[in-house]
Amino acid sequence: YRLSYKVHARIGPQEQMVVCPTTFNLPCPICQEYRLLRQNPEASEDEIKALRPKERTIMNVVDLNDLDSGIQLFDMSNFLFHDMLKQEITLNEDVAVHNFTDIPGGRSLRCVFTEESFNGRKFLKIHRIDFVKRKEDWDDSILEQAVDLDKAVVVLDYDSLKKLYEDGLLGTEAEAPSGKLKKRKVTAEEEEEEEEEEEEDPKPKK
């Protein structure tokens, strides 16, 4: 019902969000640059955070307020949604909650979001999740509408992704005064998301 994947945010001249190839065990030029920056004592924390891959989750869902649309895709960062969902499942002793996606005997999610802002940008963040007993089970035929999530995310090939990243660097360099590289604004996720770098060496101190 879901796929966890990694992305790099605000890449290229158009500041796109791109899928990180490491999601599918492929080499990523942006991750390579990220690791180099982490070893550079002159690199700023903002520069490093800007390249760090972020975790997202895409899911097949049915909006109970829009049943006519059938199965839809729900895509949000783990920091803003799935981390809480995972925690709520872990802390709940109800077997039905742990198996909430089951066709027979599962649960529906009642989600409450709050609107927050950071650096002038507004975004939604999950505030509360309730697991609600369904009035009736879904028919197995609903599964025929499910999207193949592995095909729902598009991964650029290595050379295309590298060019997109480098084109973005050229753009920021051209915009920056006195030949200095223009600094990117850090997003809320980059600022507040907990570090997930157990397998990487810490950044050297100056």
Sequence positions of predicted segments:
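Intrinsically disordered, low-complexity, charge-biased tails
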Residues: 199-203
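OB-fold ssDNA-binding interfaces and closely related basic DNA-contact patches used
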Residues: 1-99, 159-163, 167-171
